[in-house]
């Protein structure tokens, strides 16, 4: 690779916002399924207990995954914002240093 790497802090901010939204969506997905197992158990009764048990196992895994995705999205968004700030500050520091050489 001979091309220069460029970082656009504004783009990192946009990506951070996308990950914030993904975190909210993951939480919404978990909330949408909340109570489903109990509802099925009530409406279908003990006759479907094996299905209800399987559904509860699925919902437990669904909740864990949703929680993990939410945490990962929030953490990644935070890291992207920190990186954007660091790149901006470094650019500003180098700009001042270079300007100081010519004044």
UniProtKB/Swiss-Prot annotation:
Disruption phenotype: Mutant exhibits pathogenesis defects, including reduced virulence in mice, attenuated growth in macrophages and an inability to suppress immunostimulatory cytokines such as IL-12. Host (human) cells no longer produce cytokine IP-10 (CXCL10) upon infection, but continue to produce IL-1 beta (IL1B). Required for ESX-1 function. Required for either stability or expression of EspA. Belongs to the EspC family. One of its GO terms (biological process) is symbiont-mediated evasion of host immune response. Its main location: secreted. The C-terminal region is required for secretion by the ESX-1 system. The modification N-acetylthreonine is found at residue 2. InterPro entries: EspC (IPR022536). Contains multiple, broadly recognized T-cell epitopes and is a major target of cellular immunity in both active and latent tuberculosis infection, indicating this might be a good vaccine candidate. A fusion protein (p846) of 3 well-defined antigens (EspC, EsxH and Rv2660c) induces robust specific T-cell immune response and could be an effective vaccine. It holds the Pfam family T7SS_ESX_EspC. Induction: Transcriptionally activated by EspR. Repressed by the MprB/MprA two-component system, by direct regulation and via EspR. Up-regulated by the PhoP/PhoR two-component system, via EspR. One of its GO terms (cellular component) is extracellular region. This is ESX-1 secretion-associated protein EspC. Interacts with EccA1 and EspF. It is found in: Secreted. Keywords: Acetylation, Secreted, Virulence. The lineage of its organism: Bacteria, Bacillati, Actinomycetota, Actinomycetes, Mycobacteriales. It comes from the Bacteria.
